[in-house]
């Protein structure tokens, strides 16, 4: 890409942005009507026309039902998509909207609807218009929330969701360059006022970016930091894979294992680096629990309790196991974690009784 953040994107640069998607059978473009997604649609259409045989493109707009202007904006997207020779669908988020956590709920609904649209269109990928500016904002949001290394890696260029690849081809492109591209092409776009609504966290942090940029922390620097953290996170994931294989290889033949249980020899587990131990617990709890992803802070607390119990003396664990009393037993995110007989075991926890339920007949 050009080093000039205010220069329009050339046809050659657009070809590079979409190059890895050339062999896909079909692509869904998520287009809201704002400048970023309108630029995505225009650039993708121009790229497709340059190919002898490119992927089929379908434009999808999600109307969350939160603003009166959204329906008009969806119609405008459809008009422009038609001019570009692309089919368009508008999908609506129906049902009650939550009073708290609205941005997260709207985002989840949007992705669910987009994945459904991709399956209907026979598309292998959904393309979103996240930019370098979005990446910087995401890093800041996760930083102030105290996220771990995985969270601070921010958004990946390619991720899989429900069997569909979510692609962000503009992740290294500044928003200003997309706006310059649209201005040169004389293409209009919508302005979503919620992007400036300081009732939400992202707009408040967005307002801080000019001050950070004055100190050298501009979107380019923050996005570069996210990329470096993502590189480190990928390395730790490989180390965690290796640690899991190591524990399996050194385990005894009669050790309890199965699709509904993860089991580690406690002494060997304790020798691993703390971050690796934490990730092994997170993986097991998220795989076997039935109450959604575990919170990082709670898993950190669990790991500290396990470390303390193991350090207190492995000699006590066999005696406790004989008496049927685990040294440690906790539930977290729908998983049951226990330390007994010198082993850490993780399995699905029994379903919680709902208030008013009674046992027996």
Swiss-Prot record:
Q: Which GO terms describe its biological process?
A: tRNA modification
The listed locations are: Cytoplasm
- Record's catalysed reaction(s): cytidine(34) in tRNA(Ile2) + L-lysine + ATP = lysidine(34) in tRNA(Ile2) + AMP + diphosphate + H(+)
Fetch the PANTHER family from UniProt: TRNA(ILE)-LYSIDINE SYNTHASE-RELATED
The protein's GO terms of the molecular function aspect are: ATP binding; tRNA(Ile)-lysidine synthase activity
Query: Does this entry carry the keyword Ligase?
Result: yes
Gene Ontology cellular component list:
cytoplasm
Keyword ATP-binding in the entry? The reply is yes
About its domains, the entry says: The N-terminal region contains the highly conserved SGGXDS motif, predicted to be a P-loop motif involved in ATP binding.
- Say what the protein does: Ligates lysine onto the cytidine present at position 34 of the AUA codon-specific tRNA(Ile) that contains the anticodon CAU, in an ATP-dependent manner. Cytidine is converted to lysidine, thus changing the amino acid specificity of the tRNA from methionine to isoleucine.
InterPro entries the UniProt entry points to: Rossmann-like_a/b/a_fold, TilS/TtcA_N, tRNA_Ile_lys_synt, tRNA_Ile_lys_synt_N
What is this protein's record name?
Answer: tRNA(Ile)-lysidine synthase
Q: Where along this sequence does the record place binding of ATP?
A: 32-37
Annotated family: Belongs to the tRNA(Ile)-lysidine synthase family.
Q: What class of enzyme is it?
A: ligase
Q: Which gene is the coding source of this polypeptide chain?
A: tilS
| Any Pfam family the entry gives | ATP_bind_3
